[in-house]
């Protein structure tokens, strides 16, 4: 429908493609044609006057990449990849904005969520860790972690050094989970898995202190019934479950042993949790509508994508 917009349409169509539908399947083909109506001369794929150009284009790239088995979208993808690179923050590497992506070019505050979508899109297009845009993004991602290293000299890491991730160090620093009493930015689940996944896509190895610290955090906060760390645990739950599954798959883990020594077969756990939450009509929706999770189409697509990573390991 015309009210859906390219972002939700792209994520729904990607979910169908990940579950085995062909690009020539009537529903998928119709959606791909709809998405092409949002392609701009600058290469971006977004609604007119969109305040979320990076999100929409990054989601569309992942969709067209999943439908590009015969190369039919090669030119479209090359232009879209170039667009999201051009709206990535530049400047000096010492600046906290450097390497991050935000909602649109006119809004200069980048964040980890947008930057992880950028990296997801580039990875889907086959662009690897040696690409300059990926290297720049890794600089920003490292600064979103509560870990003091040579890669992160922000003031926030020392105030809450738990290895998790938060929303952004830019513009004074923001965490959707709030601040600690010491003025640190609280880590939370969706951003920690987004940060971990982003580092893996950017070529950071498992023995790197940044990855080790992130894995340590998730071992302490393993759950699929809440977005851990958030003041209201249902907020962003399905974004979290999708990001959790994609990160765990990227790590190549089948079982996660938590900090108490309990082994969690995460794929099975995720299937059980999503089966429990599925509504009689087959859809999913969040009881907490924040972050657009009152939108049944979006939340069902998140659930289907999470299941695709649990089932295929890709």
Report residues per predicted region:
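Active-site-surrounding "flap" and adjacent substrate/cofactor-binding loops of secreted or lumenal enzymes
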Residues: 32-38
């Amino acid at each position: 429908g015309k009210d859906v917009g390219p972002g939700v349409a792209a994520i729904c169509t990607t979910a169908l493609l990940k579950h085995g539908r062909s690009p020539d399947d009537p529903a998928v083909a119709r959606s791909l044609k709809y998405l092409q109506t949002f392609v701009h001369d600058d290469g971006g794929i977004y609604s007119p006057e969109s305040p979320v150009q990076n999100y929409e284009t990054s989601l569309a790239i992942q969709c067209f990449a999943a439908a590009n088995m015969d190369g039919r979208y090669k030119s479209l993808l090359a232009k879209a990849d170039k667009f999201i690179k051009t709206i990535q923050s530049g400047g000096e590497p010492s600046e906290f904005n450097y390497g991050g992506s935000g909602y649109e070019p006119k809004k200069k505050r980048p964040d980890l969520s947008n930057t992880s979508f950028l990296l997801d899109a580039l990875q889907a297009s086959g662009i690897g860790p040696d690409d300059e845009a990926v290297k720049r993004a890794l600089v920003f991602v490292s600064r979103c972690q509560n870990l003091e290293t040579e890669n992160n000299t922000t003031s926030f890491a020392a105030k809450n050094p738990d290895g998790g991730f938060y929303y952004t160090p830019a513009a004074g620093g923001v965490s959707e989970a709030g601040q600690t009493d010491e003025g640190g930015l609280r880590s939370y689940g969706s951003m920690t898995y987004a940060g971990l996944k982003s580092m893996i896509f950017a070529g950071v190895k498992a023995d790197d202190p940044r990855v080790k610290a992130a894995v340590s955090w998730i071992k302490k906060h393993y759950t699929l019934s809440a977005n851990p760390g958030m003041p209201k645990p249902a907020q962003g739950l399905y974004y979290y479950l999708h990001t959790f599954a994609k990160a765990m798959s990227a790590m190549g883990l089948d079982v996660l042993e938590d900090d108490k020594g309990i082994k969690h077969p995460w794929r099975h756990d995720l299937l059980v949790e999503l089966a429990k939450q599925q509504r009689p009509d087959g859809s999913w929706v969040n009881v907490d509508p924040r972050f657009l999770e009152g939108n049944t189409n979006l939340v069902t697509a998140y659930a289907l994508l999470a299941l695709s990573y649990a089932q295929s390991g890709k």
